[in-house]
Amino acid sequence: AKDGYLVSKSTGCKYECFWLGKNEGCDKECKAPNQGGGYGYCHAFACWCENLPESTPTYPIPGKSCGKK
């Protein structure tokens, strides 16, 4: 397992959040079936996820820079 920032596969962007620390939205995203993580919270205004499967992509995705050229 690994820890990391959740990332949108289509854009390469982190999942933004504003409620730092315990964050229901991040936790829900982290535990979603397509992510498969164990616990999510908001760190530095992005969703950080623990105990992700190695197969789940985390930020940054090589070649996708979240809108930056």
Curated annotation (Swiss-Prot):
Cysteine amide modification, residue list: 66
Residue positions assigned to the propeptide: 67-69
Signal peptide start-end: 1
Species: Centruroides exilicauda (Bark scorpion)
Gene3D superfamilies: Knottin, scorpion toxin-like
GO cellular component, one term: extracellular region
Lineage: Eukaryota, Metazoa, Ecdysozoa, Arthropoda, Chelicerata
InterPro entries (UniProt xref): LCN-type_CS_alpha_beta_dom, Scorpion_toxin-like, Scorpion_toxin-like_sf, Scorpion_toxinL, Scorpion_toxinL/defensin
Name of this protein: Neurotoxin Cex5
